[in-house]
Amino acid sequence: MVLMQKHIIQESTLRNELVPNKNTRFQINPRIQFAVLKKAPEQPTTVCDLSVEIGSMDDDSPLYIKVRMRGVFVSVAQDASGALLEPAEFNKQAFPILFEATRAYISGMMLMGGLTPINLPPIDPNKINFQGN
């Protein structure tokens, strides 16, 4: 089992140039990157970074959001052998925990900015190809 000890917001950007017209629709295609940082074998914690980017700062997209969040995780042995999770299983458990915190942060950030919050849909970690596994 994986537990998140804390999360740290490393970057948070919101640019809004939406025209207040309810008939205006645009597509939201978030780019999501998840990375597990290397750790020393004697370290009990693992650090993961998650980046979610909506829109682009370079083009004329009316909305741009970028959030980078870091999570500090600890693996807890589930049986008497004390065996910790394999990297692939760690990713499948750590990613949704950090993604949920990021989703909530993005919705809250938009609400504080006076916008209707975007509720990114949950992602099934079993359908993700974690590279490096």
Question: Model-found features: residue ranges?
Answer:
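N-terminal intrinsically disordered, cationic/polar leader segments
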Residues: 1-97, 104, 108-133
